[in-house]
Amino acid sequence: MVKSMDTSAEVRDRAVATIYRTLKLVFGLVPIVAGLDKFTNILVHWDRYLAPAIANVIPMKPSSFMHVVGIIEIVAGIGVLLTPWTRVFAWIVGLWLIGIALDLILAGYYDIAVRDLVMAISSFCLARLCAVAPARVAATDPRLRQAQTG
């Protein structure tokens, strides 16, 4: 039996599915890991990135503020990764990253701010991809195709 060549639609569907799954994994796991690290400071001492202008106006210690930030990041990551509202949570993660980038700019960490802005744009791409990706992902999964055809 000769295997037929993939159609351009099948190639496109696989590419979209791969991009979608990758972005969903990245914007699910990275916020969860960063959020958990706000409680342990294993990766970095997060307090040092809080701009003095912000540290002076928040009604708590910087470490407590970072714990609140960590909880928000964990919830956002779980929302992207494990809920049917990936699109909404991807927008939230992107906006959150812009907020972090603004703090980093105020603190003088321009290089890290640029990286967070690029991540925000990527998160917005995931949100937009959610409009077409679930159908493309289903089209590339043999188990789902078999269930649809009976």
Q: How should each PLM-predicted stretch be described?
A:
Residues 1-150:
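Membrane-interface extramembranous regions
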